[in-house]
């Protein structure tokens, strides 16, 4: 469960999140909508432990998330195994030398067995139509291929919570159709 209680955040004294209070239950889907600069990406960064409330609290599974907590390697690892973040711009997320390595990065950090990692990566490559691109460096891919790689890299981690910043950006019609089928499957799986 995610709980936000009186959360405030500002950039240079410009309020972005103002006294936000919300509870998100397991399996609940939430869509953030608003104009540019209204705080959607800021909230997603906060939910992923990349920034922290300047006022109020953010709790995940009953534990208040703080900068100190996230500096604790064991806690940070536990948290990031449970919360996945697909960035708006996939170039912000992709850094490995091949698509296959990109998809394996999270599971390797989680300490999974090599056979399990291979299976997760192969399944994600197949599901997202990336098998033929597995050995290519992400920087050589089209925007839509990069976005699918970014989504696949989170899929291989199997997080409890998915957060996506403009998941439809960079996707073509086929990618959008796939995403429209995929998102309900996450909800059905209780994520």
Predicted segment positions?
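The feature captures the beta-strand-to-loop junction immediately N-terminal to the Walker
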Residues: 33-35
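Conserved ABC transporter NBD signature motif
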Residues: 56-68, 79
